[in-house]
Amino acid sequence: MALHLTTAGESHGPGLTCIIEGLPAGLEIDRGALDRDLARRQLGHGRGGRMKIERDKVDVTGGIRHGRTLGGPIALQVANRDYANWEERMNPWPVPAELAEVHLPRPGHADLVGTQKYGLTDVRDVLERASARETAARVAGGAVAKAFLGALGVSVFSHVIQITGVRAPRRDDLEPIDFAAVDESPVRCLDADAGRAMVAEINRLRKANESLGGVFEVRAFGLVPGLGSHVSWQERLDGALGQAILSIQAVKAVSIGDGLEVAGLPGSEAHDEIFYDDERGFWRQTNRAGGVEGGMTTGEPLVVRGAMKPLPTLTKPLRSVDIATHEPAEALRERTDSCTVPAAGVVGEAMTAFVLADAYRRKFGGDHIEDVRRALQAYRERIGWRPR
């Protein structure tokens, strides 16, 4: 049984919708946990003025009754409070006023190619859906996926490891407890010194009318070995994770484990040697593979990184062309953030959680959450694996 997640809605439209299909009945859902993840997505030094307007909360319109899933599609909605300021321009129905079209595509955004592909004359018809505001719906859905994983002993976290050239020291020994206070950092960085340097870098480049990119890392703990498969490229878990992380707006690269770093190492230094003892079963001293070998989880923590480019909406616009007149012009000026890497980490959590939840559904099936637990326990006993 596969899991499906679909979102709908525009950045300044009435709201965003997320529909999740494939979760079992009987799963407990905490509305507060969903709202907390939505609030976490709005965190981070370098956010723009819209974060002062939106106070995202989730409304459930189907699939959950009295805090438990029913087994059918789950429908979630997140209202756009800013729609009150855009109602005329973003109304789903015709309005009497004649509205000026936007003809100035931004380099690095979906604007130009979107108008070409869909035969549109107004860039706003593209940018509203392409906006990262859409990820609020994904985070809401990802929070439901995290609830499912949590019921199976799996936890998912994220932190920022780099903003422009400022990088936090590498940590290979992270445990779930280490993430308890990550959201107290203004850039969601676990290293206090690096976090302060990142804040200073954001301030410096924001004054120069620049935007900033960086790298976030997602870690998942408690995963059973064998999620995914080696037998078909479509079933390889690392392929699904790569697609999910790359689908996040402005993410340009993804790595699992040491990723590109192992390309520069000899084979004897690139892999994780295997050990066995009666207490732990099979185990590895290192985790260069990031918890995935041959397209399958190994039982070690999953480590996924996403590299985000600087946002393409700039307060000092780049050169562009008016799509109506074909004359040179500056790109569109639009309200924007300077840096959203901390928020992207929260979105990365949601997307990773969805992929992992889908992998558990495909492997263990079940119409009720207790069916899933029993199937998981039987599998653990068969392979002799104990959660660490």
PLM features: residue spans?
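Generic N-terminal targeting/processing segments that precede catalytic cores or assembly contacts
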Residues: 1-388
